[in-house]
């Protein structure tokens, strides 16, 4: 918790800057954070801004209804260690401390539902003359409330995770760490209290120290790809994730698209949590 306390003091003492350096550094201003948050909420309605209410700690450089973004009850059906190298695909490095993991298909991604597998999750007892009794086996599914706020010390978004068992009981920090990729549990994950609530809500935060560098590297790759002649034939072979992103933007990454890309990288740290990160919002 000492690291968390020092981080909070650094956030408090660091002055806020309003000069945009997005294209050169990958950092954003509070105004750009708001613009990116509005875009995220518009394209992905599961995300929304906070509501003004009692019991909150407000930061004066952000509007009271734009303090943080939240999405609730995001499912996690497998632990992080179980989802590493799914399908034997090779990991792609994207800067120090960041790895792009293979993406899981969403429920509406065209994958067929295995009815037999669903039935195996249930024990059905048929008792004649009595109502059928369906007993559900314990589920390994967990749910997360995800929060995104603005880090003044790193000038990038910062993610907080608050987890629950399938019966609604809160997860312990140790349990939440099971949903952090093993390589990052000691590098980027920290136990903290949510800074925007007066009451103590224990969360796991994803440290933002590398966020700006990852975004900057991504933007450089997009720019380099755009400078190549359009008619140049693409080489055969596997494509990197950043190349897929490059195909979906017009000329370069816009600042309002920042959080969509941010969530795509967060999946490297929390591969088992089913973020609403698809690129349909581009």
Swiss-Prot record:
Keyword vocabulary terms for this entry: Autophagy, Cytoplasm, Protein transport, Transport, Ubl conjugation pathway
Name of the protein in its database record: Autophagy-related protein 3
Flexible region, as annotated region: 83-138
Chain positions covered by the region annotation Handle region: 213-257
Described function: E2 conjugating enzyme required for the cytoplasm to vacuole transport (Cvt) and autophagy. Required for selective autophagic degradation of the nucleus (nucleophagy) as well as for mitophagy which contributes to regulate mitochondrial quantity and quality by eliminating the mitochondria to a basal level to fulfill cellular energy requirements and preventing excess ROS production. Responsible for the E2-like covalent binding of phosphatidylethanolamine to the C-terminal Gly of ATG8.
Species classification: Eukaryota, Fungi, Dikarya, Ascomycota, Saccharomycotina
PANTHER family noted in UniProt: UBIQUITIN-LIKE-CONJUGATING ENZYME ATG3
Species assigned in the record: Eremothecium gossypii (strain ATCC 10895 / CBS 109.51 / FGSC 9923 / NRRL Y-1056) (Yeast)
Residue ranges, annotated region (Disordered): 225-245
Gene designation per UniProt: ATG3
GO annotation terms (biological process): autophagosome assembly; autophagy of mitochondrion; cytoplasm to vacuole targeting by the Cvt pathway; glycophagy; nucleophagy; piecemeal microautophagy of the nucleus; protein targeting to membrane
């Amino acid at each position: 918790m000492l690291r968390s306390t020092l981080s909070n003091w650094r956030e408090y003492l660091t002055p806020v800057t309003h000069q945009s350096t997005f294209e050169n550094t990958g950092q954003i201003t509070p105004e750009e954070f708001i613009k990116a948050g509005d875009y995220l909420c518009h394209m992905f309605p599961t995300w929304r801004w906070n509501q003004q209410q009692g019991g909150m700690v407000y930061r004066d450089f952000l509007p009271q209804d734009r303090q943080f973004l939240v999405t609730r009850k995001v499912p996690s059906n497998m632990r992080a260690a179980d989802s590493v190298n799914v399908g034997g695909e090779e990991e792609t490095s994207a800067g120090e401390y960041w790895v792009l993991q293979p993406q899981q298909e969403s429920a509406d991604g065209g994958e067929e539902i295995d009815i037999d597998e669903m039935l195996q999750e249930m024990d059905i007892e048929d008792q004649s003359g009595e109502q059928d009794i369906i007993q559900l086996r314990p589920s390994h599914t967990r749910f997360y409330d995800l929060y995104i706020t603005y880090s003044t010390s790193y000038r990038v978004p910062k993610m907080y995770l608050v987890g629950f068992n399938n019966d609604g009981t809160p997860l312990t920090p140790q349990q939440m760490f099971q949903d952090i990729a093993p390589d990052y549990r000691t590098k980027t994950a920290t136990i903290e209290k949510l800074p925007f609530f007066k009451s103590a809500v224990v969360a796991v935060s994803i440290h933002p120290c590398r966020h700006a560098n990852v975004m900057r590297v991504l933007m450089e790759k997009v720019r380099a790809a755009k400078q190549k002649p359009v008619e140049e034939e693409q080489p055969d072979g596997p494509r990197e994730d950043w190349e897929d992103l490059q195909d979906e933007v017009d000329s370069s990454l816009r600042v309002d698209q920042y959080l969509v890309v941010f969530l795509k990288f967060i999946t490297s740290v929390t591969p088992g949590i089913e973020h609403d990160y698809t690129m349909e919002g581009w």
